[in-house]
Amino acid sequence: MGNYILIIDGGTTNTRFTLINETQIIDYITKRIGASDTHDSAKNQRLEQAVREAIEHMETTHHCRIGTILAAGMITSNVGLLEVAHLQAPVALSQLADEIKPCKLPHISPFATFYFVPGIKFGTPGGCDSDVLRGEETEIYGAIAPEDKHKNILFVHFGSHNKIVLYEGGSITQNVTTISGELLWAIANHTILKSSIGKIDQYDVVDAYVQKGYEAAQQHNFSRSLFMARINQIIGGFTREQTLSFIYGILMQSDLSAFKPLLNERVDKLVLYGRGQFAKAFLACLNTYGPAFNGNIELLSFEESEQLSIKGLTRVYQDIIGKEAANQ
């Protein structure tokens, strides 16, 4: 039947399930449930049901038995299936493997062993430098090419939460997070701007209007600049695409301000991955308003970004298997 492994990547909004056999991807599905949906016990049961259904679907469709389940992201948090404590940075891939939590959850799958990967915490509790990762650590270790293992690289992840992460010579060392992705969703769905921009995934990013939004936020403030987006549409004749780009610029002004200390670090490469519209808006502002960056900039497509957690979790699992074999 082969060695079938299910990889679970739990996000704030969605949970992705990928079935692999050895190193080949067999199937994948995404369920619209995440950390933002599971703040009470009843909704946590929905997450358990979603995982159970995904396992049953994979096993039935592909006539297989899943024996190993690798899980990372918010599914390992207090609103997930099993809470795993964060590791204190700096953290290398081998440390993630050492601290992985194996367990049985027979009410979800009677046969599989679950392996829950810990997140990473940074700084001191209550300090301005405190922050956390859950899930992005496996994406970053999935993105590191063998020839880059000992380099210094900045990663910027664009999703429900935007993050800039510093990888230094084998370990993840620093991280800064913003809530810009969730803010964009809230603005587009629960404010008066809903009628001004429509569905946010329908439009591309227009650099010139991103920069207008950035400059408005820089000159005024966050809240005032957002209302200016509506004024620009009503009085200034902005299209929905231009208005949305303006809002991206406002969010990028906030992000670049938060990310600036790490952007000033000397690194070999800057890697952008995740949601493409955010990445394009970030580049439109970084090139004009950000600190001078002399290293290489690599932009991963959304499709490439989706594969990173699979690669990273596979590498963590291979590290575990290698250590077990060495101890026999």
Model-based region annotation:
Residues 5-46:
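Short glycine-rich, Thr/Ser-proximal phosphate-binding strand/loop in the N-terminal lobe
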Residues 14, 267-285, 306:
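Glycine-rich phosphate-binding loops at beta-strand->alpha-helix junctions
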Residues 58-105, 110-130:
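Short beta-strand-loop/turn "lid" adjacent to the catalytic site in phosphate-handling enzymes
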Residues 8-14, 74, 156-161, 180, ...:
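A short acidic Gly-Thr/Ser loop motif
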Residues 63-75, 252, 266-276:
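Short glycine-rich phosphate-binding loop at a beta-alpha junction
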Residues 215-258:
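Adenine-nucleotide phosphate-binding core of ATP-dependent small-molecule kinases
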